[in-house]
């Protein structure tokens, strides 16, 4: 467990998260308006989104399915009966004067997610609920020095709000939870998880306490937009609360904003309670009733999820848990790996994938989907190394050409004349030449200077332009030098 070091001793973090995940859907939660990102302001607004009188909301079935699939991925209970409520508050970018949400009867409850801790153990984080709600519009303050403008393109887009219990005990655990949740949503296809574009936003509820004491007063940090900022915001806010408590002051329950430039949080507004929002069932929407048949159908069509892939890679491919987690962290990488792993040694493939390929992708600032090397050609390269057709050194040269051109490795080897020399007669001839040319070094090696062995290997490789089979060279050299 992580602690905050105060002037009067240690304090514990108590953290709960609320994740707002924009549902991957072509249309909004209650209207047919488009959800395309970065469209011209107010170009994707229906009468419902603009809260024009007389227009009734119609629930988007696809958004409901996405929420159910996410709930199944979180090992949660799917409520067969849920209700939409009106959350009443006034804000300029909320034209209805209320947000349609689910307060009393959410669609999903009681899920769990396991995250790795600093000790290497797994920790279970309880998911209190997942509910459906509409997003608000966007206030724009940088268009004029005198006026603010409203863009309603985002208004009405479907969100899943995923709320944890206060089970998180450090900023790093919070970051791990968000990373793992984001990966799960991407595998399911229910949210793209792009925090930079705002399609996934994180609110953190933070309090501090002495070990064994009751929960303290919490403050909520709104709309944290990156994994790195989650850690920074929680660290700063917890330290701020400790400083106040140690100086004899009280924590005021409030909503705060995190400034990424200064690394500080500041007051946004006093924290509201549920009563302030005057929740009541939306009279324009019927209760949502979900059948067992629908739940079972969606469950049967779920893709293989990250934890399942990690288990498969460690068992079927004998990868370490760490390597499996690195590959599974990106669905596209996992898909690429599986296509190649069926054609070559998975462990050797993993080494080349996570070192050489990742290095080149980072250098070129591209994703694996843009890589010119097909999984099949990558597997061919690994097999050529495995069967000693080429050495590791030659393989790196071949790989670089493959990355630039997309050519098959065997074609490159043929064009460049890079086939590894594994003929004993040819290698013995070269070794005899090296020994004859270096009598003093031979005498030195035979008198106990073992480090000279590397010199002989280097000379053989030089004479063969690096094409000699290094394993065979070592074996033949030892035989020649010891005779």
UniProtKB/Swiss-Prot annotation:
EC number: 6.3.5.-
InterPro entries tied to this protein: Asn/Gln-tRNA_amidoTrfase_suB/E, Asn/Gln-tRNA_Trfase_suB/E_cat, Asn/Gln_amidotransferase, Asn/Gln_tRNA_amidoTrase-B-like, GatB, GatB_C_1, GatB_Yqey_C_2, Gln-tRNA_amidoTrfase_suB_CS
Known catalytic reactions: L-glutamyl-tRNA(Gln) + L-glutamine + ATP + H2O = L-glutaminyl-tRNA(Gln) + L-glutamate + ADP + phosphate + H(+); L-aspartyl-tRNA(Asn) + L-glutamine + ATP + H2O = L-asparaginyl-tRNA(Asn) + L-glutamate + ADP + phosphate + 2 H(+)
Classification via Gene3D superfamilies: 1.10.10.410, GatB domain, N-terminal subdomain
SMART domains: GatB_Yqey
UniProt-listed PROSITE patterns: GATB
PANTHER family in the cross-refs: GLUTAMYL-TRNA GLN AMIDOTRANSFERASE SUBUNIT B MITOCHONDRIAL AND PROKARYOTIC PET112-RELATED, GLUTAMYL-TRNA(GLN) AMIDOTRANSFERASE SUBUNIT B, MITOCHONDRIAL
This protein's name: Aspartyl/glutamyl-tRNA(Asn/Gln) amidotransferase subunit B
Organism: Rickettsia rickettsii (strain Sheila Smith)
């Amino acid at each position: 467990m992580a602690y905050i070091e105060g002037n009067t001793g240690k304090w514990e973090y108590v953290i709960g998260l609320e994740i707002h995940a924009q549902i991957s859907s072509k249309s909004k939660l209650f209207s047919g308006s488009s959800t395309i990102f970065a469209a011209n302001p107010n170009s994707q607004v229906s009468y419902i989104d603009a809260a024009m009188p007389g227009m009734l909301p119609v629930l988007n079935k696809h958004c409901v399915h996405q929420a159910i699939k996410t709930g199944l991925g979180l090992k949660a209970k799917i409520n067969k009966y849920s209700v939409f409520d009106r959350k009443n508050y006034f804000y300029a970018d909320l034209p209805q004067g209320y947000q349609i949400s689910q307060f009393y009867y959410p669609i999903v409850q009681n899920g769990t997610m396991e995250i790795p801790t600093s000790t290497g153990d797994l920790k279970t984080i309880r998911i209190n609920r997942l509910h459906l709600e509409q997003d608000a519009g966007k206030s724009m303050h940088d268009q004029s020095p005198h006026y603010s403008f409203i863009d309603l393109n985002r208004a009405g887009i479907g969100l899943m709000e995923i709320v944890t219990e206060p089970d998180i005990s450090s900023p790093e655990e919070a970051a791990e939870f968000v990373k793992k949740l984001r990966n799960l949503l991407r595998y399911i296809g229910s949210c793209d998880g792009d925090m930079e574009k705002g399609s996934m936003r994180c609110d953190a509820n933070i309090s501090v306490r002495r070990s064994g004491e009751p929960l303290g007063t919490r403050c909520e940090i709104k709309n944290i937009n990156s994994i790195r900022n989650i850690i920074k915001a929680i660290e700063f806010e917890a330290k701020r609360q400790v400083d106040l408590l140690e100086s004899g002051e009280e924590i005021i329950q409030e909503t705060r904003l995190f400034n990424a430039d200064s690394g500080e949080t500041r007051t946004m507004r006093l924290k509201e309670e549920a009563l302030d929002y005057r929740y009541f069932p939306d009279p324009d929407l019927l209760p949502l009733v979900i059948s067992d048949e629908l739940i079972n159908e969606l469950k049967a069509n779920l893709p293989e999820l990250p934890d399942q892939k990690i288990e498969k890679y460690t068992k079927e491919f004998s990868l370490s848990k760490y390597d499996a987690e690195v590959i599974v962290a990106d669905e596209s990488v996992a898909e690429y790996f599986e296509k190649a792993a069926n054609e070559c040694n998975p462990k050797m493939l993993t080494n080349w994938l996570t070192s050489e390929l990742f290095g080149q992708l980072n250098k070129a600032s591209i994703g694996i989907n843009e890589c010119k090397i097909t999984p099949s050609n990558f597997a061919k390269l690994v097999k050529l190394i495995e069967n000693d057709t080429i050495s590791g050194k030659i393989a790196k040269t071949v790989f670089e050409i493959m990355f630039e051109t997309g050519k098959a490795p065997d074609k490159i080897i043929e064009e460049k004349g890079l086939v590894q020399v594994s003929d004993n007669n040819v290698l013995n001839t070269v070794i005899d030449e090296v020994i004859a040319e270096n009598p003093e070094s031979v005498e030195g090696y035979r008198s106990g200077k073992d480090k000279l062995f590397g010199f002989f290997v280097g000379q053989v490789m030089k004479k063969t332009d690096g094409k000699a089979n290094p394993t065979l060279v070592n074996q033949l050299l030892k035989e020649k030098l010891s005779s």
